[in-house]
């Protein structure tokens, strides 16, 4: 079984669409998705600055578009045809994962990511909040310190890698007095994602999600909530919406990949973060970070 992974916000890089736009039909596809997202994704994915694509309202649809453009090309080449796959996406990457697993159409996925990004950006503007990575330290001590500061472990990505989220004043205190043997690194995001600070985004996102045609997953699809498979369209969409204010348990997704004895891991663009975690947590399992069309041909040997 091969794991297909869709990255989340923070993975975006300047020019990440450039190599993909050389493919037949890619420019037309991005033009259609640009219309759906009400953004010029071609420009944003080729010539826009790092600062511009860091904007939550821009980054989320751009990342989903990059992932799905690569997945469409992979499907066109039939590289993994006939092979069993298990699909997971990190945070906004879940939307792309839903499209890969057949729950929603790719066009709807990009439009939904645009709504999600816009609604979350508005929520971020209501109060100064943020996120910081806590690297290392004893997990129990780290979680205890976060609780003391009224911070939330918004992302639990892997052993020794927890992302704290909450008010900026509390994050500053965490950086000044971190848990023993832990380092704290502020993340360049606009707010405390996957916490109750995102509650103002729920109504708008839920309304957009409710208007999308859905189908039951055609592949094993994991939830960020608990790392377990979601088996119906209704459950999948409920989970997707509620995930805005709930922690991302990528560590549990990784545990499920281990239980399913995956034989290879493919991370779609903008790739690097999730395949890096997989190499550390699932030692011995080949992990490929797809960054350009040339990387797709190498997947034939998986």
UniProtKB/Swiss-Prot annotation:
It catalyses: holo-[ACP] + malonyl-CoA = malonyl-[ACP] + CoA. Its EC number is 2.3.1.39. GO terms for molecular function: [acyl-carrier-protein] S-malonyltransferase activity. InterPro entries: Ac_transferase_dom_sf, Acyl_transferase_dom, Acyl_Trfase/lysoPLipase, Mal-CoA-ACP_Trans/PKS_FabD, Malonyl_transacylase_ACP-bd. Keywords: Acyltransferase, Fatty acid biosynthesis, Fatty acid metabolism, Isopeptide bond, Lipid biosynthesis, Lipid metabolism, Transferase, Ubl conjugation. Was identified as a natural substrate of the M.tuberculosis proteasome. Was identified as a high-confidence drug target. Belongs to the FabD family. This is Malonyl CoA-acyl carrier protein transacylase. It comes from Mycobacterium tuberculosis (strain ATCC 25618 / H37Rv). The lineage of its organism: Bacteria, Bacillati, Actinomycetota, Actinomycetes, Mycobacteriales.
């Amino acid at each position: 079984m091969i794991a297909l992974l869709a990255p989340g916000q923070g993975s975006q890089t300047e020019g990440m669409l450039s190599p993909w736009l050389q493919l037949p039909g890619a420019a037309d596809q991005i033009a259609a998705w640009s219309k759906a997202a009400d953004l010029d994704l071609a420009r944003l994915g080729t010539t826009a600055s790092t600062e511009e694509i860091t904007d939550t309202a821009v980054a989320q649809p751009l990342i989903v578009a990059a992932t799905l453009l690569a997945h469409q090309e992979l499907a066109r080449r039939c590289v993994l045809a006939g092979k069993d796959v298990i699909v997971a996406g990190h945070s906004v990457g879940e939307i792309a994962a839903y499209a890969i697993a057949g729950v929603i159409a790719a066009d709807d996925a990009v439009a939904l990511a645009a709504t999600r990004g816009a609604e979350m950006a508005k929520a971020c503007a209501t109060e100064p909040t943020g996120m910081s990575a806590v690297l290392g330290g004893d997990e129990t001590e780290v979680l205890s310190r976060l609780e003391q500061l009224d911070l939330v472990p918004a992302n639990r990505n892997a052993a020794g890698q927890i992302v704290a989220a909450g008010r900026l004043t509390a994050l500053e205190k965490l950086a000044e007095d971190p848990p023993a043997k832990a380092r704290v690194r502020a993340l360049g995001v606009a707010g405390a994602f996957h916490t109750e600070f995102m509650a103002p985004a729920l109504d708008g996102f839920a309304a957009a999600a409710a208007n999308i045609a859905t189908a039951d997953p055609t592949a094993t699809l994991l939830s960020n909530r608990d790392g377990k498979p979601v088996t119906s369209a209704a459950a999948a969409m409920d989970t997707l919406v509620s995930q805005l204010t709930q922690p991302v348990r990528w560590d549990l997704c990784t545990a499920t990949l281990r239980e399913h004895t995956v034989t290879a891991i493919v991370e779609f663009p903008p790739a690097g973060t999730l395949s890096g975690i997989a190499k550390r947590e699932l030692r011995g399992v080949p992990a490929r970070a797809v960054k350009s069309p040339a990387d797709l041909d190498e997947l034939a040997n998986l």
